[in-house]
Amino acid sequence: PRPTWISEPTTDMDGDGCRDSDEDDNDDADDFEDSQDNCPTTYGTSTLGRVGCTDSDLDGWADSHDDCPVEYGNSSQNDKIGCLDSDGDGWANVDDAFEYEPTQWTDTDGDGYGDRQEGVDADSCVDDSGDSYADRKGCVDSDGDGYSDPDSSWDIGDGADAFENDDSQWSDFD
């Protein structure tokens, strides 16, 4: 007997000659079996966010989860997924205060020193913007000589500026 079923786009989406309803485990021919495919009737290459869905920029993130669906990207932190991340720290360049330094990504006080104490050029005074760099980085330096002004947690004995209003002197050892 001759089969009565005829392959048509509505019953054989991928055109492989098999009836999708009972003979084909991969209806869209995208290498993801229907049981694992979040988009079983749409050809897709995504492996992140949703498996087997459209990934226009080929970065692995399904367009529906990709904040930059037409720009290849590897960001996975904060609120920007699948966007350009030049230093590979997970933070998209647009949200990364240090886009080429993988150990730092935020600078709460905006002084150019990173908030992460474990990172390169860590800010010693995260909540207070400052220009100091000699004894501590990123703390208030009233006279601009590089040494931070003394405060309740860092005094002259620790290396703070002994002359906080005189940029020609910063220590007094006698």
Where are these regions (language model features)?
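Extracellular calcium-associated, cysteine-rich motifs in secreted modular proteins
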Residues: P1-D174
